[in-house]
Amino acid sequence: MDHSLNSLNNFDFLARSFARMHAEGRPVDILAVTGNMDEEHRTWFCARYAWYCQQMMQTRELELEH
């Protein structure tokens, strides 16, 4: 099993979950979430989190238009 790929899948799931929480108006402290990550993983995680936040906001805007 590729542990690196598994770790990225886990980080992606967490980024999506925290972005969903943010979209629901729940407080998310990304600095606390990423505090123990090394720089490479933190950068990747924050980019994925930002991407998911953007996607969820666009989805919400489309839902409000219809």
UniProtKB/Swiss-Prot annotation:
Classification via Gene3D superfamilies: Glycogen synthesis protein GlgS
TM region(s), chain numbering: none
Top-level taxonomic group: Bacteria
Pfam families found in the cross-reference section: GlgS
Biological processes annotated in GO: negative regulation of bacterial-type flagellum-dependent cell motility; negative regulation of single-species biofilm formation
Known role: Major determinant of cell surface composition. Negatively regulates motility, adhesion and synthesis of biofilm exopolysaccharides.
Assigned protein family: Belongs to the GlgS family.
Protein name: Surface composition regulator
